[in-house]
Amino acid sequence: MVKAVCVVRGDSKVTGSIVFEQESESAPTKITWDISGNDANAKRGMHIHTFGDNTNGCTSAGPHFNPHNKTHGAPEDSNRHVGDLGNIETDANGNSKGTVTDSHVKLIGPESVIGRTIVVHGGTDDLGKGDNEESLKTGNAGPRPACGVIGISN
Protein backbone atom coordinates (compact mmCIF):
# COMPACT_ATOMS: atom_id res chain seq x y z
CA MET A 1 0.00 0.00 0.00
CA VAL A 2 1.33 3.42 -0.99
CA LYS A 3 -0.13 6.51 0.63
CA ALA A 4 0.28 10.18 -0.25
CA VAL A 5 -1.11 13.45 1.05
CA CYS A 6 -1.57 16.95 -0.30
CA VAL A 7 -2.17 20.00 1.91
CA VAL A 8 -3.82 22.77 -0.12
CA ARG A 9 -3.59 26.47 0.66
CA GLY A 10 -3.07 29.66 -1.27
CA ASP A 11 -3.88 33.35 -1.56
CA SER A 12 -7.48 32.69 -0.55
CA LYS A 13 -9.27 31.23 2.45
CA VAL A 14 -9.48 27.82 0.73
CA THR A 15 -7.55 25.17 2.71
CA GLY A 16 -7.66 21.46 3.26
CA SER A 17 -6.12 18.08 2.65
CA ILE A 18 -6.39 15.31 0.09
CA VAL A 19 -5.27 11.75 0.87
CA PHE A 20 -4.39 9.12 -1.75
CA GLU A 21 -4.10 5.35 -1.27
CA GLN A 22 -3.14 2.69 -3.82
CA GLU A 23 -2.66 -1.05 -3.12
CA SER A 24 -0.65 -1.93 -6.26
CA GLU A 25 0.27 -0.43 -9.66
CA SER A 26 -2.75 -2.08 -11.31
CA ALA A 27 -5.19 -1.13 -8.53
CA PRO A 28 -7.34 2.02 -8.58
CA THR A 29 -6.42 4.89 -6.26
CA LYS A 30 -8.72 5.99 -3.46
CA ILE A 31 -8.82 9.80 -3.15
CA THR A 32 -10.35 11.40 -0.03
CA TRP A 33 -10.63 15.16 0.51
CA ASP A 34 -11.62 17.57 3.25
CA ILE A 35 -11.55 21.16 1.96
CA SER A 36 -13.02 24.32 3.47
CA GLY A 37 -13.24 28.03 2.66
CA ASN A 38 -14.95 27.79 -0.73
CA ASP A 39 -18.16 29.53 -1.76
CA ALA A 40 -21.30 27.97 -0.32
CA ASN A 41 -23.29 25.45 -2.39
CA ALA A 42 -20.81 25.54 -5.27
CA LYS A 43 -18.99 23.19 -7.61
CA ARG A 44 -15.25 23.82 -7.88
CA GLY A 45 -12.85 22.12 -10.28
CA MET A 46 -10.06 20.04 -8.74
CA HIS A 47 -7.20 18.79 -10.90
CA ILE A 48 -3.75 17.27 -10.65
CA HIS A 49 -1.32 19.55 -12.51
CA THR A 50 1.97 18.52 -14.11
CA PHE A 51 4.56 20.21 -11.91
CA GLY A 52 5.19 20.19 -8.17
CA ASP A 53 6.41 23.78 -8.47
CA ASN A 54 4.55 26.46 -6.53
CA THR A 55 7.30 29.10 -6.82
CA ASN A 56 4.87 31.68 -8.23
CA GLY A 57 1.86 30.37 -6.38
CA CYS A 58 -0.44 27.90 -8.08
CA THR A 59 0.32 29.20 -11.59
CA SER A 60 3.74 27.47 -11.56
CA ALA A 61 2.01 24.06 -11.43
CA GLY A 62 1.60 24.09 -15.22
CA PRO A 63 -1.20 22.35 -17.15
CA HIS A 64 -3.26 19.35 -16.08
CA PHE A 65 -1.22 16.14 -15.80
CA ASN A 66 -1.79 14.55 -19.21
CA PRO A 67 0.78 11.84 -20.07
CA HIS A 68 -1.48 10.34 -22.78
CA ASN A 69 -2.04 13.65 -24.64
CA LYS A 70 -5.85 13.51 -24.43
CA THR A 71 -8.40 16.31 -24.19
CA HIS A 72 -10.01 17.43 -20.94
CA GLY A 73 -12.96 15.40 -19.68
CA ALA A 74 -14.97 14.16 -16.72
CA PRO A 75 -13.47 11.62 -14.29
CA GLU A 76 -15.70 8.88 -15.72
CA ASP A 77 -14.73 9.63 -19.35
CA SER A 78 -12.22 7.40 -21.15
CA ASN A 79 -10.94 10.47 -23.05
CA ARG A 80 -9.59 12.66 -20.22
CA HIS A 81 -6.40 13.91 -18.64
CA VAL A 82 -5.08 11.70 -15.84
CA GLY A 83 -5.33 14.82 -13.67
CA ASP A 84 -9.03 15.45 -14.35
CA LEU A 85 -10.74 14.91 -10.99
CA GLY A 86 -13.91 16.84 -11.89
CA ASN A 87 -15.70 19.04 -9.35
CA ILE A 88 -15.96 18.98 -5.60
CA GLU A 89 -19.34 20.11 -4.25
CA THR A 90 -19.54 22.41 -1.24
CA ASP A 91 -22.19 22.59 1.46
CA ALA A 92 -23.93 25.69 2.86
CA ASN A 93 -20.73 26.58 4.76
CA GLY A 94 -18.38 26.21 1.78
CA ASN A 95 -16.96 22.88 2.98
CA SER A 96 -16.48 19.75 0.91
CA LYS A 97 -15.70 16.21 2.04
CA GLY A 98 -15.73 13.18 -0.20
CA THR A 99 -14.07 10.05 -1.52
CA VAL A 100 -13.70 8.70 -5.04
CA THR A 101 -11.86 5.77 -6.57
CA ASP A 102 -9.98 6.54 -9.80
CA SER A 103 -8.28 3.98 -12.06
CA HIS A 104 -6.35 6.65 -14.03
CA VAL A 105 -4.58 8.28 -11.05
CA LYS A 106 -1.51 6.29 -9.92
CA LEU A 107 0.87 6.56 -6.98
CA ILE A 108 2.96 3.62 -8.21
CA GLY A 109 4.77 3.38 -11.55
CA PRO A 110 5.99 5.73 -14.27
CA GLU A 111 2.82 7.88 -14.22
CA SER A 112 2.85 8.47 -10.47
CA VAL A 113 1.25 11.73 -9.34
CA ILE A 114 3.55 11.98 -6.30
CA GLY A 115 5.47 15.26 -6.58
CA ARG A 116 2.80 16.91 -8.72
CA THR A 117 0.40 19.68 -7.63
CA ILE A 118 -3.31 19.54 -6.90
CA VAL A 119 -5.17 22.77 -7.68
CA VAL A 120 -8.59 23.62 -6.28
CA HIS A 121 -9.97 26.04 -8.85
CA GLY A 122 -12.15 29.11 -8.34
CA GLY A 123 -14.78 28.05 -10.88
CA THR A 124 -16.83 25.07 -11.98
CA ASP A 125 -15.21 22.52 -14.30
CA ASP A 126 -17.40 22.13 -17.41
CA LEU A 127 -15.83 18.64 -17.87
CA GLY A 128 -14.72 19.37 -21.43
CA LYS A 129 -18.28 19.98 -22.62
CA GLY A 130 -18.07 23.78 -22.94
CA ASP A 131 -17.95 23.76 -26.75
CA ASN A 132 -14.75 25.84 -26.95
CA GLU A 133 -11.02 25.24 -27.15
CA GLU A 134 -10.32 26.19 -23.52
CA SER A 135 -12.92 23.67 -22.33
CA LEU A 136 -10.90 20.89 -23.96
CA LYS A 137 -7.74 22.07 -22.13
CA THR A 138 -8.92 23.21 -18.69
CA GLY A 139 -12.67 22.72 -18.41
CA ASN A 140 -12.91 26.52 -17.99
CA ALA A 141 -12.40 25.92 -14.26
CA GLY A 142 -11.04 29.42 -13.67
CA PRO A 143 -8.43 30.82 -11.30
CA ARG A 144 -6.19 28.85 -8.94
CA PRO A 145 -6.91 30.07 -5.40
CA ALA A 146 -5.40 27.07 -3.60
CA CYS A 147 -2.94 24.28 -4.32
CA GLY A 148 -0.41 21.92 -2.80
CA VAL A 149 2.18 19.33 -3.79
CA ILE A 150 1.32 15.64 -3.41
CA GLY A 151 3.86 14.01 -1.09
CA ILE A 152 4.42 10.42 -0.04
CA SER A 153 3.18 9.61 3.47
CA ASN A 154 3.27 6.66 5.84
Swiss-Prot record:
UniProt catalytic activity: 2 superoxide + 2 H(+) = H2O2 + O2
Enzyme class label: oxidoreductase
Keyword Zinc: yes
Keywords: Antioxidant, Copper, Cytoplasm, Disulfide bond, Metal-binding, Oxidoreductase, Zinc
UniProt xrefs under Gene3D superfamilies: Superoxide dismutase, copper/zinc binding domain
Residues reported to bind Zn(2+): 64, 72, 81, 84
Binding-site residues, Cu cation: 47, 49, 64, 121
Textual note on the cofactor: Binds 1 copper ion per subunit. Binds 1 zinc ion per subunit.
Main location per the UniProt record: cytoplasm
Residue ranges, annotated region (Disordered): 124-144
Gene Ontology molecular function terms on file: copper ion binding; superoxide dismutase activity
Cofactors demanded by this protein: Cu cation; Zn(2+)
Subunit structure: Homodimer.
Family according to the record: Belongs to the Cu-Zn superoxide dismutase family.
Role summary: Destroys radicals which are normally produced within the cells and which are toxic to biological systems.
Protein name: Superoxide dismutase [Cu-Zn]
Source lineage: Eukaryota, Fungi, Dikarya, Ascomycota, Pezizomycotina
Gene assigned in the entry: SOD1
